[in-house]
């Protein structure tokens, strides 16, 4: 049966915009929240304070805050760090290293001893240590206090012992916000950690954020303890981007909605990946611009040949702060995540199911040459099914995630097919495919425009599927509809050609690379990062590589080959490459932490730059490459 194209197209467009209308309240709420929370603050890690060289008599804190630092991260120093002089007049040694005259004053001679040599702070430091290690004991010898912890030094080398209370006193008195970073608690219990935190927050009201450090979350295995503490005391829990800390996710979940995003790059990553300073500054800016990160920790540059200077570091801070200010980032302290209206989720859930069922029906129509969307009864069943699935998905999140994942895949496939079936009017085809991605992408974004997804506490499982499913769908329908000269049985019944083997290997390799590179910085070289940053500065939003370098240029070349009836056996490669553009564009809408206007601008930039680049490549190929190829062929 032939498809009633005009009726089907009308029903398809009507239901598509119905879904968009239902998703609009969620999109408006998201845009309002993104505008209201456009704020980002720079944070300095106090662990690096001693490494900064400054002119004698200059106040480092004042200079840093004048440059643009808004908060300070206070790490809980480990025994190893105390032994290296991380805190003035404080050190930690094995008990066996003490003089016998001091050691014999303790009830037993083993353990780790924290030596406190500052009389003005010794009492406060002892109060913290007594709560952090209840079984510890302290003795005084003149103006020096020895506090012994009943755990061997090797156990406390990577465990939290004592923060820099002197700096905390100074900054808290000045009202400067503090980010306290408790280290792993191998030497104390969760109850002791909680008591020490209660004492610390009571003594220093400027502590606003908790940011656990180390490979293992503080209070492990009770990973929810720290998050619950933050929530009860009105603190924020830092959600560190790309963190590999064991137990961090459960800590953040326990603190919800008292969560704030934080981006930091440690010294080892900078050295390993050779991240030069301009790239580091741009990376932090992109974290704020593309992922709405509110706290940016700018550490010293380990790649500089000489010792870090305060003036140089302050120059970096000023440059980054100026760029943030110029682009509308305010200096407001972050607040707990808001709650979205329930009615928005209700409408957007139905919208997502309408989109998925609509795209599924359209693909079935294409594959089997039947008409579904022209039948009123079928449209009624589709609408009723969408409502039922939408309501159920509010209580079974798996339905929303599956619906979103498959809707994204079918959307990219449909956009690719729409654009390529308009090969007689190429510009119209490219525009219609892109508009379909925009409308469908907004519907998907509307369903997941809720704080849990915007703050990445819940992850969308359809990102990878939205990249791979369209390739499979296009390949199946092309073989079935004989877009490729051979049918699937014919291909399978003959031996594979060497060109097909090479092509299959290239496609498989490309798919693997695409999956590995679908993150922000994974498997991306320094030179490519420089190129990305240049594009971002020129265009305002960097187009994605799969769109402007691969997919849309492939669409332009395919249009030409189709119109000229050339290379019929190899055009399928270009058709599959075209799906990468639309898959990537849909994929951009699935990054729900990215501001929506940036997603729209990035998609548009990828579309027009890709078509322009494809046109230039086609012109060069036809004007210069084709004559050269003919001449070589005649010589052979």
Positions of predicted regions on the chain:
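Generic structural signal for short, solvent-exposed loop/turn connectors between secondary structure elements
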Residues: 1, 52-56, 420-424
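Hydrophobic secretory-pathway targeting helix
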Residues: 1-49
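Alpha-helical transmembrane segments of integral membrane proteins
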Residues: 4, 10-21, 347-636
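Soluble extramembrane regions of membrane proteins in the secretory/endomembrane system
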Residues: 33-342
């Amino acid at each position: 049966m032939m498809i009633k194209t005009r009726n089907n197209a009308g029903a398809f467009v009507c239901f598509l915009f119905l879904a968009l209308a239902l998703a609009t309240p969620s999109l408006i709420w998201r845009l309002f929240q993104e505008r209201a929370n456009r704020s980002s603050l720079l944070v300095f890690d106090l662990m690096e304070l001693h490494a900064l060289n400054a002119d004698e008599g200059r106040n480092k804190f004042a200079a840093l805050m004048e440059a643009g630092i808004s908060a300070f991260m206070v790490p809980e120093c480990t025994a190893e760090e105390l032994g290296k002089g991380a805190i003035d007049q404080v050190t930690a040694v094995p008990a066996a290293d003490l003089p016998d005259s001091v050691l014999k004053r303790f009830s037993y001679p083993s353990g780790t001893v924290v030596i406190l040599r500052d009389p003005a702070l010794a009492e406060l430091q002892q109060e913290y240590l007594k709560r952090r290690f209840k079984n510890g004991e302290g003795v005084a010898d003149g103006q020096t206090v020895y506090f012994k912890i009943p755990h061997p030094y090797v156990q406390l080398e990577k465990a939290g012992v004592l923060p820099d209370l002197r700096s905390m006193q100074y900054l808290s008195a000045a009202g400067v916000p503090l980010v306290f970073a408790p280290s792993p608690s191998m030497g104390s219990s969760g109850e002791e950690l909680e008591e020490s935190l209660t004492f610390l927050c009571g003594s220093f009201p400027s502590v606003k954020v908790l940011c656990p450090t180390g490979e293992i979350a503080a209070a492990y295995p009770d990973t929810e303890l720290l998050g619950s503490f933050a929530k009860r005391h009105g603190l924020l829990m830092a959600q560190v981007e790309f963190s590999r800390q064991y137990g961090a996710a459960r800590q953040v979940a326990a603190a919800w909605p008292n969560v704030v995003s934080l981006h930091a790059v440690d010294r080892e990553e900078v050295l390993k990946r050779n991240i030069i300073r301009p790239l580091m500054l741009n990376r932090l800016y992109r974290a704020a611009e593309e992922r709405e990160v509110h706290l940016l920790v700018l550490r010293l540059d380990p790649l500089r040949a000489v010792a870090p200077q305060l003036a140089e570091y302050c120059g970096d801070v000023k440059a980054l702060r100026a760029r943030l200010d110029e682009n509308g980032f305010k200096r407001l302290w972050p607040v707990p995540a808001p709650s979205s209206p329930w009615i928005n989720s209700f409408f957007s859930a139905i919208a997502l199911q309408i989109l998925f069922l609509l795209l599924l029906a359209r693909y079935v129509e294409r594959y089997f040459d039947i008409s579904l969307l022209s039948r009123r009864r079928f449209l009624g069943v589709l609408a009723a099914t969408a409502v039922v699935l939408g309501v159920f998905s509010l209580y079974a999140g798996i339905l929303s995630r599956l619906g979103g994942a498959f809707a994204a895949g079918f959307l990219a496939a449909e956009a690719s097919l729409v654009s390529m079936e308009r090969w007689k009017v190429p510009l119209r085809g490219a525009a219609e495919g892109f508009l379909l991605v925009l409308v469908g992408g907004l519907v998907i974004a509307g369903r997941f425009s809720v704080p849990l997804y915007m703050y990445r506490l819940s992850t969308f499982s359809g990102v990878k599927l939205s990249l791979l499913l369209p390739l499979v769908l296009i390949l199946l329908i092309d073989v079935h509809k004989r877009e490729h000269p051979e049918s699937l049985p014919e291909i399978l019944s003959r031996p594979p050609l060497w060109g097909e083997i090479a092509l299959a290997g290239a496609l498989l390799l490309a798919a693997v690379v695409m999956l590995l590179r679908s993150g922000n910085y994974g498997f991306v070289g320094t030179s490519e990062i420089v190129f990305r940053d240049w594009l971002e500065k020129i265009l305002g939003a960097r187009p994605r590589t799969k769109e402007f370098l691969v997919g849309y240029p492939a669409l332009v070349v395919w249009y030409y080959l189709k119109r000229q009836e050339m290379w019929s056996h190899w055009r399928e490669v270009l058709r599959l490459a075209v799906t990468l553009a639309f898959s990537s564009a849909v994929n951009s809408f699935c990054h729900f932490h990215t501001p929506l206007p940036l997603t729209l601008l990035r998609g548009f930039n990828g579309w027009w730059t890709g078509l322009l680049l494809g046109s230039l490549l086609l012109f060069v190929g036809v004007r210069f490459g084709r004559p050269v190829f003919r001449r070589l062929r005649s010589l052979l």
